[in-house]
Amino acid sequence: MVREEVAGSTQTLQWKCVESRVDSKRLYYGRFILSPLRKGQADTVGIALRRALLGEIEGTCITRAKFWSVPHEYSTIAGIEESVQEILLNLKEIVLRSNLYGVRDASICVKGPRYITAQDIILPPSVEIVDTAQPIANLTEPIDFCIDLQIKRDRGYQTELRKNYQDGSYPIDAVSMPVRNVNYSIFSCGNGNEKHEILFLEIWTNGSLTPKEALYEASRNLIDLFLPFLHAEEEGTSFEENKNRFTPPLFTFQKRLTNLKKNKKGIPLNCIFIDQLELTSRTYNCLKRANIHTLLDLLSKTEEDLMRIDSFHMEDRKHIWDTLEKHLPIDLLKNKLSF
């Protein structure tokens, strides 16, 4: 049956989620297939996606903790069952979900005797805890216990040099990897010149995002990585003249929008990516840092939201407006935009 589906060489490449489950609050699983692929393509896609899923997706972690009147991280605190080192390890395991950029502050301030869990962390509005039952420490006596925390969004495994912090602040080796594991396998089918491959992709995440969301973000990161190669450099133009110039994808915003306008249901704004807009590299990078990936994301923001983005200036706002006004129906702009 599968052989009949992929035998035709003219079939469109399609992907599908064939299994999705939640094993626990901190363990999500998803299984996907992509087909039909020509011989060798499944391995190429599988390797690229696996590396992007494990290394290119950002996560939010606790990166620093500040204790009061603690001489070193191996100290014990009277009235607390765990040592400072054990508390730091427990904080390292806390799974957070957010879209923040930069460093944010959080804190814990409780009175014993009681168990301290992730639910006791006082977080900024843009951050939430995936599993509030994660343990931190056990207060065995009626003492006041306070910790100042630092939260940061990053990617990969981040380490800091151990220093003698006089203020009681200790770095935490953060693992900013929402994807816990990725496996892929390849199934070949067909005969002779019509032989094709099916890619099976398995993704496990820590609950801060779903496997489907992780696959989407990894795919977008790969697309962004290859964007510079979609435009050949003009003959006789030096690299220095082109290094700061943004190069849009092959399908321009105008062409995509023209096709979308033919849809009677209206324009699917979540199908237009900001990569397809005629934006400067600086404006484009500002929007990407703020997790604005599609036109729907952009139109959902107010002017105040945009102006709060790091390095976003008034000229960026004007440039975005001019671009949208040029290509979008004016009634859509009036309904969607508040700036």
Swiss-Prot record:
Cellular component GO terms held in the UniProt record: chloroplast; DNA-directed RNA polymerase complex; mitochondrion
Signal peptide coordinates: none
Entry annotated with the keyword Cell division: no
GO biological process, one term: DNA-templated transcription
Domain of life (superkingdom): Eukaryota
Annotated region described as Alpha N-terminal domain (alpha-NTD), given as residue ranges: 1-233
Compartments reported by the entry: Plastid, Chloroplast
EC number: 2.7.7.6
Reactions it catalyzes: RNA(n) + a ribonucleoside 5'-triphosphate = RNA(n+1) + diphosphate
Disulfide bond residue pairs: none
Molecular function terms, GO-annotated: DNA binding; DNA-directed RNA polymerase activity; protein dimerization activity
Family matches, as CDD domains: RNAP_alpha_NTD (cd06928)
Keywords from the named record: Chloroplast, DNA-directed RNA polymerase, Nucleotidyltransferase, Plastid, Transcription, Transferase
Stretches the record annotates as Alpha C-terminal domain (alpha-CTD): 264-339
Family: Belongs to the RNA polymerase alpha chain family.
Record-linked NCBIfam families: rpoA
Domain-related comment: The N-terminal domain is essential for RNAP assembly and basal transcription, whereas the C-terminal domain is involved in interaction with transcriptional regulators and with upstream promoter elements.
HAMAP family referenced in this protein's UniProt entry, alphabetically: RNApol_bact_RpoA (MF_00059)
Subunit structure of this chain's protein: In plastids the minimal PEP RNA polymerase catalytic core is composed of four subunits: alpha, beta, beta', and beta''. When a (nuclear-encoded) sigma factor is associated with the core the holoenzyme is formed, which can initiate transcription.
Protein name per its UniProtKB record: DNA-directed RNA polymerase subunit alpha
